[in-house]
Design a protein with these regions (language model features):
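Calcium-regulated, polybasic anionic-phospholipid
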Residues: 82-95
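Autoinhibitory propeptides
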Residues: 1-56, 97-185, 191-270
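Short glycine-/aliphatic-rich beta-strand segments at the starts of folded cytosolic domains
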Residues: 60-85, 171-189
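Acidic-leg catalytic submotif of subtilisin-like serine proteases
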Residues: 266-285
Length: 285
């Protein structure tokens, strides 16, 4: 029997394991049976309560008006595991043809359901388009489709609760957020205003590292602060998408496999292949 070939040049990171499917929002979604009127009215009341509390928090801040939030973070909680949140309805942009599109509301992070907690999705709703977001739920109550079902049924029926967003909802690293230390703020790069960013960091006396990283559509800003100060950033116009624990690494190999993949995909998007017959230089280090 021939000897098995040596494949030392291949590295297998981890092994195959069975996991429940967590990606949802694409295609058909099982719809949770609920009482239409009771459920719809309760969700509208919860959304209104979050918006009202957010406005009270802004009014109590001693900040320049320019440093106050121009949108509200909401956390949508699912019900049973079988009825996933309709994630593809949680991002909507304006439909301008000649001017850049602006977000009406954006899906930021998703926490899959576990044995102890239901699925949670954190979104950001622009102040300018609050009324359109609430209209999704009002239409659910009053408008029927041609199939005699509530409009936006798959979206609204599968949301069990709507609540204010806290640090834990934006935190995507393992474990609990620290009380003090370094934090990686992931910002939506297209909406970052560098001057505004510097003013917010100065207003809350946050120490910024010299290291800034761009990956795909995200700008990662590393800051040193207490947990209390980080919580205040939710009430500012910074376009936060998630908050992570920083990775202090000496080399690319120190990154996790998923983090390496992010950097490789980002590099691939920025590299153009040379044409056939182009000069080739071999650099030996």
């Amino acid at each position: 029997m021939p000897e098995s070939p040596r494949l030392d040049h291949l590295y297998v990171n981890g092994y195959v394991e069975s996991r429940p499917r967590t990606a949802r929002g694409m295609g058909k979604t099982a719809i949770r049976p609920v009482d239409r009127e009771t459920h719809g009215k309760r969700l509208i009341e919860e959304i209104d309560a979050v918006f009202e509390k957010e406005q009270e928090a802004r009014d109590s801040q001693v900040l320049d008006p320019e440093l106050r939030a121009d949108g509200t973070y909401l956390t949508l909680e699912g019900g049973e595991v079988a009825f996933g949140l309709k994630l593809d309805s949680l991002t909507r942009m304006t439909r301008h043809q000649k001017t850049p599109k602006r977000p009406q509301w954006l899906l930021l992070t998703v926490h899959p359901a576990t044995e102890n907690f239901p699925e949670r999705a954190t979104i950001w709703v622009s102040d300018e388009f609050r009324y359109k977001f609430i209209k999704l739920f009002k239409d659910y109550l009053t408008v029927d489709t041609k199939h005699n079902r509530p409009k936006n049924n798959a979206l609204v029926a599968n949301i069990s609760h709507v609540q204010a967003t806290f640090l834990d909802d934006l935190w995507t690293s393992k474990g609990m957020p620290p009380y003090d230390g370094w934090w990686d703020l992931w910002l939506e790069n297209s909406r970052v205003d560098n001057e505004l960013l510097q003013r917010v960091l100065a207003a809350f006396e946050l120490e910024e590292s010299q290291q800034r990283t761009r990956i795909n559509d995200s700008l990662i800003v590393r800051v040193h602060a207490t947990q209390k100060k980080i919580k205040h950033l939710i009430a500012t116009p910074l376009p936060l998408t998630e908050i992570r624990a920083p990775s202090f690494i000496d080399s690319f190999d120190d990154l996790s496999f998923s983090e390496q993949s992010e950097y490789v995909l980002d590099l691939d998007a920025r590299v153009s292949s040379a044409q056939a017959g182009a000069p080739v230089v071999c650099h030996l280090d």
